[in-house]
């Protein structure tokens, strides 16, 4: 319903901000990653939003990027994860870190987020697999362009994100593309 707010930043009190849009102040809850990147009070601000209507409240959640909003929307689709928990997850880690944790099945990273226990972390890993954008999690762990090319080659050959990431970790960081692909294929063939 309300997809974006643009106006003047009137107040900042984590995790809530107030955005004045032509005399109407909207209370918006934002993840800490967005909060830390907000301008000073009185400056222009633009937030992508997700509007939640409940029986007892109407709440706006705001995000600096479309990736954050998309991740939030994927998180709240999961049973047992509401908007507050989704906001907590995005406050505890970036979208790229979340995608990497899901791709590499690292539940321990999710458990460190307040409000996420072992069962919820396992559910997140299972239900978010492949839903946070193509290769965003694996790409977050790539150190340089040649490793990115090696990763893309392995994915194009049909290897899963997890297999490709594991093979990439075993390679020296300064390896060339053709040599890296050869070594990765050898490691995956074992």
Swiss-Prot record:
Any one GO molecular function term: four-way junction DNA binding
Cite the residue spans of the region called Flexible linker. Answer: 137-141
Q: Could you name the domain of life of the organism this protein comes from?
A: Bacteria
Where found in the cell? Cytoplasm
Which InterPro entries does the annotation name? DNA_helicase_Holl-junc_RuvA_I, Hlx-hairpin-Hlx_DNA-bd_motif, NA-bd_OB-fold, RuvA, RuvA_2-like, RuvA_C, RuvA_C_sf
Q: Which SUPFAM superfamilies does this one have?
A: DNA helicase RuvA subunit, C-terminal domain, Nucleic acid-binding proteins, RuvA domain 2-like
Task: For the region Domain III, give the residue spans.
Answer: 142-190
GO cellular component, alphabetical, reads: cytoplasm; Holliday junction helicase complex; Holliday junction resolvase complex
List the residue ranges of the region (Domain I). Answer: 1-64
Keyword tags: Cytoplasm, DNA damage, DNA recombination, DNA repair, DNA-binding
Q: Which GO terms describe its biological process?
A: DNA recombination; DNA repair
UniProt main location, coarse: cytoplasm
By its UniProt entry, which HAMAP family does this protein fall under?
A: DNA_HJ_migration_RuvA
Q: How does it assemble?
A: Homotetramer. Forms an RuvA(8)-RuvB(12)-Holliday junction (HJ) complex. HJ DNA is sandwiched between 2 RuvA tetramers; dsDNA enters through RuvA and exits via RuvB. An RuvB hexamer assembles on each DNA strand where it exits the tetramer. Each RuvB hexamer is contacted by two RuvA subunits (via domain III) on 2 adjacent RuvB subunits; this complex drives branch migration. In the full resolvosome a probable DNA-RuvA(4)-RuvB(12)-RuvC(2) complex forms which resolves the HJ.
Question: Anything noted about its domains?
Answer: Has three domains with a flexible linker between the domains II and III and assumes an 'L' shape. Domain III is highly mobile and contacts RuvB.
Q: Which family does it belong to?
A: Belongs to the RuvA family.
UniProt function note: The RuvA-RuvB-RuvC complex processes Holliday junction (HJ) DNA during genetic recombination and DNA repair, while the RuvA-RuvB complex plays an important role in the rescue of blocked DNA replication forks via replication fork reversal (RFR). RuvA specifically binds to HJ cruciform DNA, conferring on it an open structure. The RuvB hexamer acts as an ATP-dependent pump, pulling dsDNA into and through the RuvAB complex. HJ branch migration allows RuvC to scan DNA until it finds its consensus sequence, where it cleaves and resolves the cruciform DNA.
Protein's name according to its UniProt entry: Holliday junction branch migration complex subunit RuvA
The organism's lineage is: Bacteria, Pseudomonadati, Pseudomonadota, Betaproteobacteria, Burkholderiales
């Amino acid at each position: 319903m309300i997809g974006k707010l643009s106006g003047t930043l009137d107040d900042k009190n984590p995790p809530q901000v107030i955005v004045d849009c032509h005399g109407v102040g909207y209370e918006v809850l934002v993840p800490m990653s967005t909060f830390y990147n907000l301008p000073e009070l009185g400056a222009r601000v633009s937030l992508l939003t997700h509007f939640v209507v409940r029986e007892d409240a109407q709440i706006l959640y705001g995000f600096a990027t479309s990736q954050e909003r998309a991740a939030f929307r994927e998180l709240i689709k999961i049973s047992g994860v509401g908007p507050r928990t989704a906001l907590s997850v995005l406050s505890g880690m970036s979208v790229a870190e979340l995608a990497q944790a899901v791709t590499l099945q690292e539940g321990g990273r999710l458990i460190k987020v307040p409000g996420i226990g072992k069962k919820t972390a396992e559910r997140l890993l299972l239900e978010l697999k492949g839903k946070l954008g193509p290769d965003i999690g694996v790409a977050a762990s790539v150190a340089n362009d040649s490793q990115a090319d090696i990763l893309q080659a392995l994915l194009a050959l049909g290897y899963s994100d997890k297999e490709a990431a594991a093979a990439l970790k075993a390679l020296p960081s300064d390896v060339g593309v053709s040599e890296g692909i050869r070594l990765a294929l050898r490691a995956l063939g074992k």
